[in-house]
């Protein structure tokens, strides 16, 4: 319920106080329909079913009454009465307005009834939902001019009836003609039972209630408390922040390349053939040439290095530096002479010419697009790993805690609760002031992002403070939040004192309550994970609500340190269900491949709030085309996002002998090793820089350039997932490889002709800090009184 400055207790008192001024009025249901977001049921209609179903973010119902006779009345209280038709009762429940007309239908068993309402259609086959047209979430839960509230129903009575409280503003909108009924959703979703440390998880329990098509005695109904007189001013509704589609620009033509014949075959970082052994590169860029056999000698007036490609099973991927390697890498100096540089390869006793054409523009040292190599559980946090990523224009970020919240890289906690920073500063300080990277191609640019060790179980002891329940406002004692705020303040204050103002310091909650659940027939264990909610990839309203509370506490704690780049990061795989709960709360949103389904919604909302947006997923698999990683970067830039995050990129001790689909950085005997896939991500980041420089130098709108990129053959990808929470991998269409290769040539040749002056940074993707003190408080309605 959006009620500024109001607590749940005060709200209950005020609601009770209006009863003397308005008598309860029973209002019958005029129409209802149960719909489903489950993938195979999204066009199904159950408007004629005898039951209505609630099931987390999978199944919901629409319900309505005839509001015409109540026009001009003021709503002071409202509730919905439902009779349970299943053993599991309702928990906290949302009631939202619906901002578009809908059709009840007569379907059952998820019938695809033409003209009836479903999750995907306002009228099946005839009318999509408005907004971005994706589904009903575009017209409910705060979008499309809708408003919502949630609250706790009464416990079931002796006859299995429950009463759901409704925000009076939600009903008022119906009376005033600003709504077409009510969307009802289960906010609890999955449940668990705990007996000591024994843990049992129940995924998406079914919650059934009788519909109006059951019988008169079981039919749901509303109770309204109405008064004469003008209604209170309608709540201010935040305008939808959809990113409007732009007409694609005309990209520069593909340049005509010099014809050259050679019997030597070679491929570039995209895994594509290099015609005439002629490479093209900007100043400050790195390019590669992979030969079928190692040359005896390489000569050229540009810095270069060589790598061997040891096999892992049937695949090649990890790279070992070698003076006799067959992968050649050329790092173009920023002061390199523009134009053609001729080199010579000694192959089979013959001298074979090759060429590196240096374009007359320079890649910036500070990144416009961040390809973040994510990692977990790496105990060796030596600087070599971070240097390897930095050298490749990539950002390594390693989460410093595991499922139980135990930290592996945090300042020592003194008995008085303060931190001893000595060892932590020695380890990470050079990466935060940039000195660790001073001798690398980008120079002393600090690492772009660093996870903080803060989590639900550090430095707080979760079990000492957790009181249970699904709703975070009642789950912890005040001491828990005080300890958390003190710690967050301590980090921000220390960073401010050290002058570390470039790196994004990310507070991120990664754990999930269902990690406690048993696997492979083993019983669940409460101690297996410290999270009582799904923090990473939140699923249910209870999860988003908990994440919101942590964010409010975090921003309150770090508010005094304005110059430190503080971030509240979260991984989002269900942006359609986050409502406005994260608006003004998170500022780094790492969004799954579902970004491809909701780009206008996600990008528009995040740009409005100054957020950084990544797309996360998996890297290309061993044996797949390297161009996938490059195309992923180009596509993500074109969608309007600021970077990509392959969710796991660090191999283990066996990755050099057993194929590892996720290893992009390999542990070697003498330190970390790069890979072909790592260099493909670098090529993708560099292409994103081309796109950024082109849009700025040409004066073209970024989104119009993005539309042109997405219109190229094969560059609108799909996401392949093997299970619901799979990060997924990108599947590009036919022609993607050629489109990416030609895109690079189009932009490079155009920029070469324009010769824009170098800049340290062409675009700053880093987010603005959030200030939730300006947000309207959201308060859950208490359970209705018995009257």
Question: What do these predicted regions represent?
Answer:
Residues 454-465, 472, 476-480, 484-581, ...:
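Catalytic domains of carbohydrate-active enzymes that cleave complex glycans
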Residues 87-172:
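Beta-strand-rich interaction/scaffold domains
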Residues 586-656:
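Catalytic-core region of carbohydrate-active enzymes that cleave or remodel glycosidic bonds
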Residues 241-275, 286, 294-328:
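Surface-exposed binding patches on compact interaction domains or structured appendages
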Residues 68-72, 169-173, 331-338:
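Short, surface-exposed loop/turn segments at beta-strand-coil junctions that are enriched for proline
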Residues 306-308, 330-334, 342-561, 569-583, ...:
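Aromatic-lined carbohydrate-binding surfaces of glycoside hydrolases
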Residues 165-236:
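Proprotein-processing/basic-patch segments
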Residues 35-91:
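A short beta-strand-loop element at or near the start of a globular domain
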């Amino acid at each position: 319920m959006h009620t500024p400055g109001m607590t749940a207790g005060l709200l209950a008192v005020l609601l009770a106080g209006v009863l003397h001024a308005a008598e309860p009025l029973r209002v019958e249901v005029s129409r209802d329909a149960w719909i489903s977001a489950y993938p195979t049921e999204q066009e199904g209609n159950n408007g004629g079913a005898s039951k209505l179903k609630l099931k987390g973010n999978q199944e919901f119902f629409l319900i309505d009454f005839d509001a015409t006779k109540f026009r001009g009345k003021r709503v002071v209280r409202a509730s919905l009465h439902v009779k349970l038709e299943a053993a599991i009762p309702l928990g906290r429940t949302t009631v939202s307005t619906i901002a578009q007309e809908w059709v009840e239908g007569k379907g059952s068993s998820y019938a695809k009834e033409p003209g009836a309402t479903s999750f995907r259609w306002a009228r099946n086959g005839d009318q999509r939902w408005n907004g971005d047209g994706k589904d009903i979430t575009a017209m409910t839960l705060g979008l499309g001019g809708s408003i919502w509230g949630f609250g706790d129903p009464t416990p079931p009575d002796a006859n299995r009836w429950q009463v759901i409280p409704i925000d009076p503003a939600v009903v008022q909108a119906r009376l005033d003609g600003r709504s077409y009924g009510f969307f009802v959703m289960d906010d609890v979703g999955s449940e668990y039972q705990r007996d000591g440390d024994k843990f049992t998880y129940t995924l998406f329990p079914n919650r059934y209630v009788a519909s109006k098509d059951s019988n008169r005695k079981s039919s749901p109904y509303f109770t309204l408390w109405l008064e004469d007189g003008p209604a209170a001013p309608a709540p201010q509704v935040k305008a939808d922040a959809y990113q409007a589609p732009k007409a694609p620009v005309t990209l520069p033509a593909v340049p005509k390349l010099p014809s050259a014949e050679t019997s030597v075959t070679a491929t570039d970082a995209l895994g594509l053939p290099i015609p005439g052994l002629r490479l093209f590169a900007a100043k400050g860029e790195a390019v590669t040439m992979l030969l079928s056999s190692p040359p005896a000698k390489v000569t050229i007036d540009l810095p270069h290095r060589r790598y061997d490609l040891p096999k892992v099973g049937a695949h090649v991927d990890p790279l070992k530096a070698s003076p006799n390697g067959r992968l050649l890498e050329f790092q173009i100096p920023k002061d390199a002479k523009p134009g053609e540089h001729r080199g010579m390869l000694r192959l089979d006793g013959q001298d074979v010419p090759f060429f590196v054409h240096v374009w007359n523009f320079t890649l910036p040292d500070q990144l416009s697009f961040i390809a973040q190599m994510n990692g977990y559980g790496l105990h060796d946090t030596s600087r070599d790993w971070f240097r390897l990523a930095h050298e490749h224009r990539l950002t390594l970020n390693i989460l410093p805690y595991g499922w139980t919240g135990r930290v592996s890289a945090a300042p020592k906690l003194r008995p008085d609760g303060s931190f001893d920073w000595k060892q932590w500063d020695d380890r990470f300080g050079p990466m935060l002031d940039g000195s660790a990277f001073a001798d690398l191609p980008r120079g002393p640019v600090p690492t772009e992002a660093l996870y903080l060790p803060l989590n639900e179980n550090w430095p707080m002891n979760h079990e000492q403070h957790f009181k249970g329940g699904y709703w975070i406002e009642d789950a912890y004692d005040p001491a828990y939040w005080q300890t958390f705020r003190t710690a967050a303040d301590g980090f921000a204050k220390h960073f401010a004192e050290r002058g570390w103002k470039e790196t994004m310091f990310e507070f991120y909650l990664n754990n999930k309550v269902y990690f406690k659940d048993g696997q492979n027939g083993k019983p669940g264990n409460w101690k297996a994970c410290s999270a009582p909610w799904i923090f990473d990839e939140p699923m249910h309203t209870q999860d988003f609500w908990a994440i919101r509370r942590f964010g409010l506490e975090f921003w309150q704690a770090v508010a005094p340190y304005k110059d430190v780049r503080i971030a509240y990061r979260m991984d989002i795989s269900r942006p359609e269900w986050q409502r406005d709960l994260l608006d003004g709360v998170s500022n780094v949103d790492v969004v799954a491949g579902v970004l491809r389904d909701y780009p206008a919604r996600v990008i528009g909302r995040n740009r409005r709030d100054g957020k950084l947006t990544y797309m996360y997923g998996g890297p290309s698999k061993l044996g797949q085309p390297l161009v996938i990683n490059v195309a992923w970067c180009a596509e993500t830039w074109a969608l309007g996002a600021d970077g990509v995050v392959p969710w796991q990129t660090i191999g283990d001790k066996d990755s050099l002998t057993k194929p590892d689909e996720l290893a992009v950085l390999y542990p070697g005997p003498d330190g970390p090793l790069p890979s072909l896939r790592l260099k493909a991500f670098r090529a993708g980041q560099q292409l994103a820089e081309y796109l950024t420089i082109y849009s700025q130098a040409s004066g073209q709108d970024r989104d119009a350039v993005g539309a042109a990129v997405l219109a190229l053959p094969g560059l609108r990808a799909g996401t392949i997932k093997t299970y619901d929470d799979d990060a997924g991998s990108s599947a590009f269409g036919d022609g993607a490889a050629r489109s990416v290769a030609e895109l690079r040539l189009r932009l490079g040749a155009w920029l070469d002709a324009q010769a824009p002056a170098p800049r340290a940074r062409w675009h700053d993707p880093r987010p603005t800090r959030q200030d939730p003190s300006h947000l309207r408080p959201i308060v859950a309605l208490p359970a209705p009184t018995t009257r």
